[in-house]
Regions:
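Bacterial N-terminal signal peptides
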Residues: 2-15
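Low-complexity, acidic/polar, glycine-enriched regions of mature
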Residues: 19-189
Length: 189
């Protein structure tokens, strides 16, 4: 019915908008208490790193998942990795290409409860101009207006043209990367 009314109004030169969907409450991230980290593998060794600068726009309530949304923007130039040489290599064009692609963005407008507890955000991650679907699994505890969320996403870096496929000079970097996050936020307003 709403679609028919909008179509009729449009043909008559009038503008109309559909009723806005209800939004879950907004949360403001506490950057000092939040972390965004990753773990990859080089040969058989775990390589750990993270991003020092990221923001999150979050709307969430356990009883209003239909109105929930997440948007995370990551300053890719803020990447830190074990060993200073690795960080410089990772910023380069063959890997993250931070000069041309300084920001990565994750957006999700679909969040669902998972059997056994926790949540899954069905979102899209954009890195180096490539957009790929990425599910984000997380748990959240809300107490006295403060939310603490811990979760992960499992990525295949080569899906985003990040780094080579296979070994280079005898060094093999696994395509799988675990992204881990800890976000603390206070209820806005």
């Amino acid at each position: 019915v709403i679609t028919a009314v909008l179509a009729l109004a449009s043909t008559m030169g009038m503008t109309a908008t559909a009723p806005a969907a209800a939004q879950a409450p907004a949360w403001e991230m506490d950057p000092a208490a939040s972390r965004l980290e990753f773990v990859g593998r080089q040969n058989d060794d775990a390589v750990r790193g993270g991003f020092n600068d990221f923001t999150a726009s979050i709307r969430f309530a356990p009883d209003d998942l239909e109105g929930a949304s997440i948007r995370i923007e990551v300053d890719m130039t803020s990447v830190e990795v074990e060993g200073s040489e690795r960080g410089e290599i990772l910023r380069g064009s063959a890997w993250l290409g931070v000069e041309d692609f300084p920001t990565a963005i994750f957006t999700a407008d679909a969040i669902e409860a998972v059997a056994g507890g926790g949540y899954r955000a069905l979102g899209t991650l954009e890195i180096k101009g490539y957009e790929r679907p990425v599910p984000l699994a997380f748990d959240v505890v809300i107490t006295d207006g403060r939310a603490v969320a811990d979760g992960r996403a499992d990525l295949v870096r080569t899906n985003f043209d990040v780094g080579p496929e296979g070994a280079v000079f005898g060094v093999r970097v696994a395509p799988e990367v675990d992204v881990l996050f800890h976000i603390e936020a206070v209820r806005a307003g």
